[in-house]
Amino acid sequence: MRQHVNPLSRSFQLPLRLPPPSELFTHPEHPIHLDIGCARGRCILDLADRHPNWNHIGVEIRRPLVIPADREALESPHGNVRVLFCNANISLEGWMETLPKDRLQRVSIQFPDPWFKRRHRKRRVLQPRLLMAIASALQPGKDFFIQSDVREVIDPMVALTELSGCFDRPENDAHPWRRTNPLTVPTERERYVMDQQLPVYRVLFRRNHTHQPPIEEFEQHWQEIDNPGNAPTPDA
């Protein structure tokens, strides 16, 4: 059962300092995989064990999930995985800005909380500013992977990412959805959904060479598409 928390609650609006790689990993020079909304962290803990030459960091807004997950991460013999508490839309942008160029090589958002009602748009994890921060931190050719079992959740994520112009799909990837998870390790939610023989909607994007659009224009354009009834009216 998913335990939702409202990311717009006052308690989640304080920016947190996330430690730099040098304070998190035994080999901070290794490439980083960032998993946003990692829940209990089972996926990245398994990935870290299978890929010791990568560093893996999961961020999660539900603190009761973070505490046991990071405790287990700290026991890894490779020193290459951590799970941190934060609101991704408040604290991640500043952290990604401090990373050395090309250090962040993969970002994933897997089965985010299904805020699909119109009035809950601002609670979605993938907001325009976070997407632009991801686009800024990823060098061309690096991966941004998203998946969900709820069409009302994945469709806006795909539309927003495509609207940015900063990402393309791999040339030979299946459309509209990938059949397989490129990470090769399923999340707990993914296992549950597949055991029920229900569909999973997956899209792999790759950062291209397109410059990011100005954030204010991008946010306004997205508002016009995603919630046209409340879009700001240009001055006469």
UniProtKB/Swiss-Prot annotation:
Q: What is its EC number?
A: 2.1.1.33
Which residues participate in S-adenosyl-L-methionine binding? Answer: 35, 60, 87, 113
Q: Which GO terms describe its molecular function?
A: tRNA (guanine(46)-N7)-methyltransferase activity
The answer on whether this UniProt entry bears the keyword tRNA processing reads yes
Task: Provide the residue positions that the database annotates as binding substrate.
Answer: 117, 149
Q: Name one Pfam family in it.
A: Methyltransf_4
This molecule's function is given as: Catalyzes the formation of N(7)-methylguanine at position 46 (m7G46) in tRNA.
Q: What is this protein called?
A: tRNA (guanine-N(7)-)-methyltransferase
Gene (UniProt): trmB
